[in-house]
Amino acid sequence: DAKLIFEMASVGGDVRIRSRFAEMMRLVAANRQLFPNKPWQGAPSLVADFRVDRRPRRFPKRERLPADILAEHGSVLGGSQLRQDLWRALTAREGMKLAGFQERAALRLSAATDDGGTIVTAGTGSGKTIAFYLPGMIRIGETISTDHWVKAVAIYPRIELLKDQFAEAFRMARTIDQTLASHGRRPMMIGALFGKTPTRATRQELTDKTWAQRGEDFVCPWMRCPRCDNELVWRAVDIAVGTERLACVQPNCGQEIGDDQIVLTRTSLQRNPPDILFTTTEILNQRLSDHWMRGLFGVGLTSARKPLLALLDEVHTYEGGTGAQAALTLRRWRHLLASPISWVGLSATLGDAARFFSDLTGADLDDVVEITPTLEEFEEQGAEYQILLRGDPASRASLLSTTIQTSMLLPRLL
């Protein structure tokens, strides 16, 4: 059923077995430059040679029980009953264990770093996001009260990544709702500021921001239902009265998200700022010059209402001209804040991560710490494959054609 093995008839009539990966490589190596209404038999070949690299896939071992970590480091993680309860709520998932680097990140980030920096480097799927949000939500949660101000700004280089992490942060925030309520505090609020964030709750505004429609309702472009993963819509009846509320399109689900948990419009971002604000480097650069919106990032506010944390994801992508522009924006924001903030970066492995992050944010190199899994903390699990293709110079086809044809072929094989 998984189509991992194929039966291939040979010229002599025998049946031969070929794995899906081997069949994929055969098709990739035989790739040709195709055009509409032209026979493929005479089309130029695109691949002259290939190499396959297979290596064990290595992940950080997750062996540490959250309860043991709290017991060993109670003075750091659990300085108050609220902090202890938040830790237990965030780590209550059955069977949850933490890796060594996640534990070290939690210990460092659970307290203020006085304008210092922390960069967490690990491979994809290693749990870097948890390494930030676990201690981050403890610090944010203990400062929540009846008033509203942005306590953490999460900055992303790409909108799609912002959407993924927004959903994950929202799910984590909901795990501590009861804990916060038991301590007399409101739920944690999350908001997003990027191109599709409407200014106000009107049908025309949502249309202008290219929100997709489902009948009379509008589909939220940056979040799906946390319960069943269906679309969330802003109902026409709620838009008409200016109520910011999302509802799942699946009738049997019944999930609703109100304005005490999510902020949908720029006007509401100004009126009731969220506890965590998701944005992009481009929007940050634009809004720092906007006197109506710059207060959302802590500019011009008292020191007690300025962000505690600044998260930068995919730090390794900030290179070249794009990286220089991002660094200028971050240093400008840091100067305008004129107040200590804990810089946190998440990244793939970098050669000199601490110096790279210091150059990016302007934080003093002596105050920047890299947290990464040690060699002893890895375990092998599965395998990863890398395929290198060399274009065929004899065909006079560009490497771009090879890239396009291969990109079209691979999704049909995976």
Residue ranges and their predicted role:
Residues 1-89:
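N-terminal accessory nucleic-acid engagement/regulatory domains that precede
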Residues 63-121, 130-138:
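Conserved pre-motif I regulatory segment
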Residues 117, 138-167, 176-186, 335-340:
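Conserved SF1/SF2 helicase motif Ia
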Residues 130, 149-175, 191-201, 282-286, ...:
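Conserved Walker A/P-loop ATP-binding site and its immediately adjacent core
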Residues 161-258, 358-368:
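Conserved helix-turn-beta segment of the N-terminal RecA-like "Helicase ATP-binding" lobe
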Residues 204-226, 350-414:
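Conserved interdomain linker/interface between the two RecA-like ATPase lobes of SF2 helicase motors
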Residues 274-277, 282-288, 292-337:
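SF2 helicase catalytic motif II
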Residues 316-377:
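Post-DEXD/H (motif II) to motif III coupling segment of the RecA-like Helicase ATP-binding lobe
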